[in-house]
From Swiss-Prot:
Gene that specifies this protein: norM
Designated name of the protein: Probable multidrug resistance protein NorM
UniProt KW Membrane keyword: yes
Gene Ontology biological process: monoatomic ion transport
NCBIfam families listed in its UniProt record: matE (TIGR00797)
Recorded superkingdom: Bacteria
Membrane topology of the entry: Multi-pass membrane protein
Keyword annotations: Antiport, Cell membrane, Ion transport, Membrane, Transmembrane, Transmembrane helix, Transport
CDD domains documented for this protein: MATE_NorM_like
Transmembrane stretches, start-end: 14-34, 56-76, 97-117, 134-154, 164-184, 196-216, 241-261, 283-303, 320-340, 353-373, 389-409, 415-435
Sample GO molecular function, one term: xenobiotic transmembrane transporter activity
Single GO cellular component term: plasma membrane
Length: 458
């Protein structure tokens, strides 16, 4: 980041920072996208099984990934304070924490997976595929979380294009192993949807290997000599990471887990409905990478201006990012409506499932618009280091308002499964309204603080 004078300069810099982030996010999500699409081509049971497995895994990963994202500002502040010697220490503590988290996830998953699946009203084949898909995926959990730590280091140095390169390099690897393992090509067994789990695990090991080579062999990362000294575990540093990361992680978890909860509650419906719901959520979430990338960029830009106490510049970046997100949300809504039939055909050859996908996609237009407002505002608030109140707002909006509304409509009205989607829309809209109020409050607080600082210096 650098100081800018005009709105045009801000717009150009915003896009320069955002585009590598957007490509990276789309690439990462594309792996889940191709898991779903290619599993759907193997059969409705495979699509439903992967849907259930993903619904259990994605909230866990995104929430814990959010915790580790706290490393980015911690490392960035060390560099900004010219404490470059602290970077290897902070990085290794994050690395140790990521390994501890991944081992805990595997152990807890081994204990609770069977009871969770048994408690769901799943067809036997769907339950088997979901379980074996997650077992396959588990082989890649450790490298995935270690890579997250390395990515935080890379991004904190502003080298977002490196992350983009690694992601784009890994995508064809994921597609290749999906193809050979799901459909049994090149002498591999035909695993169906289960193969998508093993393909993801292989890809995660590949990503980690490339990332390690980059930070060990390529400047500016080599300047830090990250692995020259292996420090002991510091619970004090872990506490610092967790105090900042847990509110971020829980906020992300509450938003992503609401979709997972709806998918799990939909297990009372038939396999076609489960499969169609997951396909629609998958495509809508793919488009969600746009406001998410805008949010990440806003955190960087607004945080930079807040640190420099430039009130109007921070406000301009906020308006710029939120307006851009709303425009892209409208564009995404039009794309979903116009292309809902071709999109449905990407996921399945089953006419009943394809018809249901199209119906769900129409509902997804409305929560796409809510996300276009709520998500960038979250990015702005993180730029202000405001994480605790948005966490509470997310909890109330999604779990106290959204999910109960969806459950009541789905089970006590003629809407059936569509009731859950109305609940999702209600929760997201509530969160967007609450966050808008919080943003105005934080901007007024920042203006007062900056004014007092100027008066004190004059």
């Amino acid at each position: 980041m650098k100081p800018t004078e005009t709105l045009q300069e801000k717009g150009k810099l915003f896009l320069v920072v955002m585009m590598p982030i957007l490509i990276t996010q789309i690439g990462l999500y594309a792996m889940n996208f191709f898991d779903t699409v290619m599993s759907g081509q193997a059969g409705a049971n495979d699509l439903a099984g992967v849907a259930i497995g993903s619904s259990l895994w994605v909230p866990v990963f995104t929430g814990l990934n959010g915790v580790l994202l706290a490393l980015t500002p911690i490392i960035a502040q060390s560099i900004g304070a010219e404490k470059r010697d602290d970077v290897p220490y902070v990085f290794l503590q994050g690395l140790y924490l990521s390994i501890a988290i991944s081992i805990a996830v595997i152990l807890i998953g081994a204990v609770v997976l069977d009871p969770i699946l048994s408690a769901m009203s799943l067809e036997d084949e769907v339950g088997r595929i979901a379980k074996e898909y997650l077992i396959g995926l588990a082989f890649g959990i450790v490298p995935l979380f270690i890579y997250t730590t390395i990515r935080c280091l890379i991004d904190s140095l502003g080298e977002t294009r490196v992350t983009m390169f690694i992601t784009l390099l890994s995508l064809p690897i994921n597609i290749f192993f999906n193809y050979v393992l799901i459909f049994g090509k090149l002498g591999f067994p035909r695993l169906g949807g289960v193969g998508a789990g093993y393909a993801s695990a292989i890809t995660y090991w590949f990503i980690l290997a490339v990332a390690i080579v980059v930070v060990v062999k390529v400047r500016p990362f080599t300047d830090f000599q990250l692995f020259k000294k292996l420090y002991h575990v510091s619970l004090k540093k872990w506490k610092e990471i967790l105090l900042l990361g847990l509110p971020i992680g829980f906020t992300i978890f509450f938003e992503t887990s609401i979709f997972a909860a709806v998918t799990l509650l939909m297990s009372t419906f038939d396999t076609a409905t489960i499969a169609a719901h997951q396909a629609a959520v998958n495509f809508a979430s793919f488009l969600y990478m746009i406001p998410l990338s805008i949010a990440f960029t806003l955190t960087i830009a607004v945080g930079y201006e807040v640190g420099a106490k430039r009130v109007e510049d921070a406000r301009q970046y906020s308006r710029l990012g939120i307006t851009f997100a709303l425009i892209m949300g409208l564009v995404a809504g039009v794309i979903i409506y116009v292309l809902r039939a071709p999109v449905a055909s990407l996921y399945t050859n089953d006419s009943q499932v394809a018809w249901l996908i199209q119906q769900f996609l129409i509902y997804s237009i409305f929560f796409q618009l809510s996300d276009a407002l709520a998500t960038p505002i979250q990015g702005v608030l993180r730029g202000h280091k405001d994480v605790n109140v948005p966490f509470v707002m997310a909890l109330v909006s999604f779990w106290i308002i959204g999910l109960p509304t969806g459950y009541l409509l789905a089970n006590f009205s003629p809407l059936g499964p569509y009731g859950y989607w109305i609940g999702l829309i209600t929760g997201l809209a509530s969160c967007a309204i609450a966050l808008s109020w919080r943003l105005k409050q934080m901007q007024r607080k920042f203006e007062r603080a900056a004014r007092l600082s100027q008066n004190g210096n004059s």
